[in-house]
Regions:
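Glycine-rich anion/phosphate-binding loops
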Residues: 73-76, 99-113
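Extracellular adhesion/carbohydrate-binding repeat motifs centered on closely spaced tryptophans
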Residues: 1-32
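Conserved, mostly hydrophobic/aromatic
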Residues: 35, 49, 84, 127, ...
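Acidic (Asp/Glu)-rich catalytic clusters
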Residues: 44-53, 75-89, 112-121
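Solvent-exposed loop/turn segments at secondary-structure junctions
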Residues: 39-42, 56, 62-67, 97-102, ...
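Boundary/entry segment of secreted carbohydrate-active catalytic domains
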Residues: 28-64
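Hydrophobic faces of well-ordered beta-strands that scaffold small-molecule active sites
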Residues: 33-37, 55-59, 89-95, 125-127, ...
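Surface-exposed substrate-engagement region within the catalytic domains
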Residues: 114-125, 129-191
Length: 191
């Protein structure tokens, strides 16, 4: 119960610096907490993350440039990957895609496999599809069919490279910008 309102707490709550999840009735539920990190989170106290109850980390491995289309390694990838592992956390990765066709999506997946170089993952390699910062990214104008084809091409290439594939998007994108029904054979990460 909330100490101020005396009402049941719901959702994710931090109690004594530990994370807990409560359903709509205030009943504590089993939950596994994870975080995603990239260059935007540069100073992470990994022991504090673990102590807070986080069990896994999805690290951004890279992205494709909004305008140029160049593949870019996230400058914090190696540090985040290594430090999360050293803290005893399970790890997966995601790639922020701006692929505009299936060949580019496969290229992104191949780039992930190249950087990982055989390293084992506990969670998938996720195809991250979302709008660019100013909605001026090269893939922002893709229709549902083309975006779905890109996601499938990425995931199939990830499988061919020996890794588990997944797709990461918001609820809105899974409803309106990509065909979720065609992605059911892949891990789904809903943001």
């Amino acid at each position: 119960y909330d100490q101020y309102t005396n009402q049941p707490v719901t959702g994710i709550q931090s109690i004594d610096n530990k994370l807990y999840y409560f359903d709509a009735n205030g009943v504590q539920q089993d939950a596994t907490f994870g975080i995603d990190v990239s260059k935007y989170q540069s100073n992470i106290d990994w022991e504090q993350v673990k102590t807070a109850g986080v069990k896994f980390v999805i690290v951004r491995i890279g992205y494709r440039g909004y305008g140029s289309g160049a593949l870019v390694l996230d400058p914090m990838f190696e540090q985040h990957f290594t430090n999360a592992r050293n803290a005893g956390l399970k790890v997966g990765v995601y790639f922020f895609s701006q692929a505009v066709n299936e060949n580019e999506a496969r290229e992104e997946a191949q780039g992930c496999a190249y950087v990982l170089n055989g390293r084992k993952l506990d969670y998938p390699i996720y195809f991250d599809t979302e709008a660019s910062g100013g909605s001026n990214g090269r893939a922002d104008g893709l229709g549902v069919e083309d975006r779905t084809k890109c996601a499938i091409a990425f995931c199939e290439e990830v499988k061919a490279q020996g890794y588990q594939p997944g797709v990461y998007a918001s609820t809105l994108w899974f409803r309106k910008r990509i065909d979720l029904n065609r992605l059911k054979s892949y891990s789904i990460w809903n943001a």
